[in-house]
C-alpha cells in the first residue's frame, strides 16, 4: 500500500441544502454505507468517530443520516436480504457519489462510454436524483444530482470525510471519468510503491482544488480489491486504531506515513473497509 494520492481534504466545502448544488460536476458529493447489522454498525462508528445517526423512519426503510458534530457525513442503509443484478447478496461497503448536473444524461453518457447501470436514475423525494453505475474497470460509483440535499459537509474536524480515491489496475479509467464526469485529471508525477516500482497518480483538479484521486495500483493490490476508497480524518492514529480493535473492527494495512497524514486501512465489524487519516501526523516531503 502507498500513501494517498492527494491533498489532506477534498475541495468541496459546502452547505447541505439549496435548490442548486454548489459543487462542480465530477466532484465528490455523498457517501453511503451498506450494512447487514445496523445496531452493530452504529455502535462501531459512533465509538470510533463519535458520529450521530438519524433514523429517517419507515417511509425511508429506516435508512439513517450520518452526522459528525451535526455536519452531514452520508447515509447508512441496511442491505440484509438484498441482492444485486447478478443475484449475489449486496455486501457491506462504503459507496462514493460524484456530483452531476443531470442524472439521466450523465447515466446515458456513462453507458456510451462502457459502463453498466446498476441502479437507474431515480428521484429521492425532493432531495435529488441518484443513479449507480459500474465503470468499465468494474468499480461501482454513484451519481448525485442535488435537489434540496447538496451533499456531505467538510468541516476539517476529526470524523469528517477528507479524501476519496479510485484504486485501479486500469489507469486508462481516467478517460472514462473525463468523458462522463468532466474530470480535470492532473498528474502528480511518479512516486514509488513499497517494492520500488513507479506509481502513477492523478487528482481531479490541481493542488488544493483537488476533490479526489486516481491511482494506478497494479502491483500494489490484488485486482479484486480495487475500487473507490474513502478517508476519514482522526486526531490520533493510535487512539483511533485502539477504538477500531475494541469495537470489533480490524486493521488491514498500515499505518503509513505521508505528507497528507498518517494513513491506515481498516475494516468495520461487517468488513466494510475505509481509511483513517491523522492529518496532524503528516510527514514533511523531502
What would you call each of these model-derived segments?
Residues 24-26, 89-92, 125, 157-160, ...:
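Short glycine-enriched loop/turn motifs at secondary-structure junctions
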Residues 36-39, 67-72, 96-136, 170-171, ...:
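Vicinal oxygen chelate
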Residues 146-168:
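Solvent-exposed, charged amphipathic helical/linker segments at domain boundaries
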Residues 28-32, 45, 51, 91-100, ...:
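Short, structured motif recognition centered on aromatic/hydrophobic residues
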Residues 12-16, 22-25, 29-71, 112, ...:
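Core segments of cupin and vicinal oxygen chelate
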Residues 119, 150-154, 184-185:
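Short helix-to-loop capping/linker segments positioned immediately adjacent to catalytic or ligand/cofactor-binding
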Residues 2-6, 51-89, 136, 140-147, ...:
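Conserved short beta-strand elements that form part of the metal-binding/catalytic scaffold
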Amino acid at each position: 500500500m502507498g500513501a494517498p494520492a492527494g491533498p489532506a481534504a477534498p475541495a468541496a466545502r459546502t452547505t447541505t441544502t439549496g435548490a442548486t448544488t454548489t459543487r462542480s460536476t465530477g466532484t465528490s458529493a455523498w457517501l453511503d454505507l451498506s450494512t447487514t447489522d445496523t445496531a452493530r454498525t452504529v455502535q462501531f462508528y459512533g465509538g470510533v468517530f463519535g458520529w450521530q445517526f438519524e433514523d429517517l423512519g419507515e417511509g425511508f426503510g429506516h435508512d439513517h443520516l450520518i452526522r459528525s458534530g451535526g455536519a452531514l457525513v452520508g447515509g447508512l442503509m441496511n442491505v440484509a436480504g438484498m441482492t444485486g443484478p447478478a443475484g449475489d447478496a449486496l455486501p457491506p461497503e462504503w459507496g462514493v457519489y460524484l456530483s452531476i448536473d443531470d442524472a439521466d444524461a450523465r447515466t446515458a453518457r456513462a453507458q456510451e462510454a462502457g459502463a453498466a447501470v446498476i441502479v437507474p436514475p431515480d428521484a429521492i423525494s425532493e432531495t435529488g436524483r441518484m443513479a449507480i453505475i459500474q465503470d468499465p474497470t468494474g468499480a461501482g460509483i454513484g451519481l448525485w444530482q442535488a435537489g434540496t440535499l447538496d451533499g456531505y459537509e467538510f468541516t476539517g474536524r476529526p470524523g469528517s470525510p477528507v479524501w476519496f480515491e479510485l484504486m485501479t489496475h486500469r489507469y486508462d479509467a481516467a478517460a472514462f471519468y473525463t468523458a462522463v464526469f468532466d474530470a480535470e485529471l492532473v498528474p502528480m508525477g511518479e512516486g514509488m510503491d513499497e517494492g520500488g516500482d513507479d506509481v502513477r497518480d492523478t487528482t481531479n483538479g490541481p493542488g488544493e482544488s483537488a476533490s479526489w484521486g486516481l491511482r494506478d495500483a497494479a502491483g500494489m493490490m490484488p485486482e479484486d480489491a480495487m475500487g473507490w476508497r474513502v478517508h476519514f480524518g482522526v486526531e490520533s492514529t493510535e487512539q483511533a486504531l485502539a477504538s477500531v480493535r475494541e469495537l470489533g473492527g480490524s486493521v488491514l494495512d498500515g499505518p503509513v506515513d505521508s505528507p497528507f497524514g498518517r494513513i491506515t486501512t481498516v475494516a468495520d465489524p461487517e468488513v466494510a473497509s475505509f481509511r483513517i487519516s491523522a492529518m496532524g501526523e503528516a510527514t514533511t516531503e523531502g
